[in-house]
Amino acid sequence: KVDELKDKEAYKKEWNIDGWQASLDRMTPEQREAWIASYKPRNEKFINENLKGEDLVKWKYQRYIKDYVRCIKSIDDEVGRLIAYLEKEGLMDNTVIVYTSDQGFYMGEHGWFDKRFMYEESFRTPLIIRYPAKIKAGSECTALVQNIDYAPTYLDIAGIEKPDYMVGTSLVPLFGGETPKDWREYLYYHYYDYPAIHMVRRHDGVRDSRYKLIHFYGEKNEHNDAISCNELYDLQSDPNELNNLYDNPEYADIQTRLQARLDKFRVDQKVDEY
């Protein structure tokens, strides 16, 4: 737990060596020993090579992608162990399996590693559900869902009424393959943790089944100009979000519609900065 760290303030500012050391304090002695055994030789090799320019960029990418793939392999192995146990105990048909994450990830797309931006690579979240009694194997759903829908879904499956204070909508109505007519048509996103270690500018936005509007905002930059810029994408014709259509006359109606919806989200969610 963060509250149990020796240096909580350093951990919150982990872009420096003190913060890095504080993050190691989260590990048990056994975990720390395993971490050092794995990374110390590679780190020392990196320091001794004193890489520059393109060689440094390639090294960073290889380090990142290998750790990323190893993480996927580890998760796959552990999920496999869980499924093997359920099969052994005869519990597979009496268990709902949900495979998901808190976001997607960038591996160089948009010149970025990590997450946080509203572009599709991190905005789209993995979600696989196995529920033989309700969901046909291999079926797909294109409805707009959010992670705030998970808890109401679990309660619904268990036959428990959702508390009034809980946001989100049960996904159970989607299990049959049809999307209810009153299902949500838009998603709202807001990132506001700036300045911070990742230095991602504040932005919010709205997405429907095809289009996305993003608004970047914030304090003055090095040119003494207040940051305020917008991006509009057609995700059907431009899935990689490389062609900004904002202020394109051909998309004026779409831009106006999305802006109106974004403004409504800001009011409904009591957003006080944008």
Per-region residue spans from a language model:
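Active-site-proximal cap/lid insertion segments
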Residues: 1-145, 157-165, 222-227, 249-253
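C-terminal cap/loop subdomain of S1 sulfatases and analogous C-terminal strand-loop tails that border
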Residues: 103-109, 148-151, 156-231, 235, ...
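Carboxylate-dense, calcium-coordinating segments in secreted/extracellular and ER-lumen proteins
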Residues: 241-245
